[in-house]
Design a protein with these regions (language model features):
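Bacterial N-terminal signal peptides that target proteins for export
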Residues: 3-15
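Catalytic-core regions of hydrolytic enzymes
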Residues: 35-160, 164
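Structural motif
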Residues: 263, 271-282, 377, 385
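A short, solvent-exposed beta-strand micro-motif common in secreted/extracellular proteins
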Residues: 325-336
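Short, acidic Ser/Thr/Gly-rich low-complexity loop/linker segments typical of extracellular
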Residues: 288-316
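Hydrophobic core positions of the immunoglobulin-like beta-sandwich fold
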Residues: 318-320
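Extracellular beta-sheet/turn segments enriched in Thr/Pro/Gly and aliphatic residues
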Residues: 340-376
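Active-site-adjacent mobile loop/cap segments within catalytic or ligand-binding domains
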Residues: 56, 130-140, 146-149, 186-262
Length: 390
């Protein structure tokens, strides 16, 4: 995310009308599609009691704005996350179609900063959740920001309140999940003006700093899910299934904030690395319970971002919807590596802990390719053997 400018953009009445008309449209088959590793079946409308609560999801930016490493953008990542949150909400809960709105649902729609809050205000949203990732840092951390400032040494949250309460769920849920893979921690769940202007006991501007918090008429929060300028995170951001994990952490937080139970969904995920140098391995075939997953390769996806076949590696795999409490045999196979077989028992989600829905199984594989002796090494060895005879 770039720091949002303190201005009100020109509002497009057409954009607002289009968004309001689109709110009742069901999720498309393409949006809902998952590959063979997703759950074979899930209980429809498992969570009831959504009521008339209106949720507005704001995948930050538009198109391919805020490009990170290798050209993959923040706008693309957060759109995928928002669409997956929508998928989980419509799959697991009885949320009415007219009570969920996204400010954009494809990579072509352009929504200005000011339009986002105006659409939410015109629609009458009860909560505004803005999804972002960050840039330009050396440590891969999260942060959640709700509207607030300091008055005479006292922190004040904007009204209607609720952003802080939502962040108290989302921040640990998202951070603990991401720490399993590439994140190092969090910068906190913060009043936005206090975050950008720390150390002041009495802010002169007593209103939220971020536009989405300042201009929205409802409780709101903006999250930063790691840094798209850090390689370890960005190589995961490119992976389709990894983003489903971030989406589920947000989905789980939304349910907790709204006072609803969390579904007992499960995920098995991990990173497969070379045992000698810890570099993630591309093209590993992972098999469990008759399902297979092959880690990303240059041919499958990385060619979209680089001509260097050896530049990007994530070694990430994920299976969704395995049976909680059951022990599975997991096999890892890759050309040039010894096959690895592991036993894993799937944790049961829905117990309230931040990452109890994901069972993490990281694996190291050993390269079995024969050692290559250079011409120099060969000549040196012959000289040594010859001299040892005398």
């Amino acid at each position: 995310m770039t720091i949002m400018k303190n201005y009100k953009s020109t509002i497009s009445k057409f954009a607002i009308a289009a968004a309001l008309c689109a709110v009742a449209m069901p999720i498309s088959a393409q949006d809902a599609a998952t590959d063979s590793v997703a759950a074979d079946s899930v209980p429809a409308k498992e969570i009831t009691g959504w009521g008339d609560f209106k949720l507005f999801l704001d995948p930050g930016h538009s198109g391919k704005e805020n490009r990170g490493l290798w050209g993959y953008s923040e706008a693309e990542k957060v759109l995928d996350i928002a669409l997956t949150i929508k998928e989980y909400l419509t799959t697991y809960t009885d949320i009415p179609a007219e009570n969920l709105m996204l400010c954009r649902e494809d990579g072509n729609t352009v929504v200005d900063l000011g339009e986002r809050s105006d659409i939410a205000n015109a629609w009458g949203a009860d909560f505004f959740y803005s999804i972002h990732s960050d840039a330009a840092a050396t440590k891969n951390t999260t942060v959640t920001l709700f509207g607030g400032w300091m008055t005479d040494g006292v922190e004040v949250e904007k009204t209607p309140t609720g952003g802080k309460a939502f962040g108290e769920f989302l921040n640990p849920y998202l951070t603990d999940l991401m720490k399993e893979f590439a994140c190092t921690g969090t910068r906190g769940n913060c009043y936005d003006r206090c975050f950008y202007y720390p150390g002041e006991s009495n802010h002169s501007n007593k209103y939220p700093y971020l536009s989405v918090n300042r201009e929205s008429n409802m409780a709101s929060l903006l999250s930063e899910g790691g840094y798209h300028t850090i390689a370890e995170q960005q190589q995961l951001n490119i992976n389709v299934e990894y983003k489903r994990l971030e989406a589920f952490a947000a989905f789980q937080s939304i349910l907790k904030y709204h006072g609803l139970q969390v579904p007992k969904q499960t995920f098995l995920a991990g990173i497969i690395a070379n045992s000698e140098n810890q570099v993630p391995i591309n093209g590993v075939k992972v098999t469990v319970d008759g399902k297979t997953y092959t880690t990303d390769t240059w041919e499958s996806v990385f060619n979209l971002f680089t001509k260097n076949e050896n530049l990007i590696h994530n070694g990430f795999y994920m299976f969704e919807g395995l049976t909680a409490g059951q022990t599975y045999e997991v096999t890892f196979e890759a050309t040039g590596y010894d096959t690895v077989t592991k036993q894993v028992t799937i944790k049961e989600g829905g117990q309230g802990a931040s990452v109890d829905f994901v069972t993490v199984l990281d694996v190291e594989m050993t390269n079995n390719a024969p050692a290559i002796v250079s011409v120099f090494q060969s000549k040196t060895l012959k000289m040594f053997l010859h001299s040892s005879l005398w």
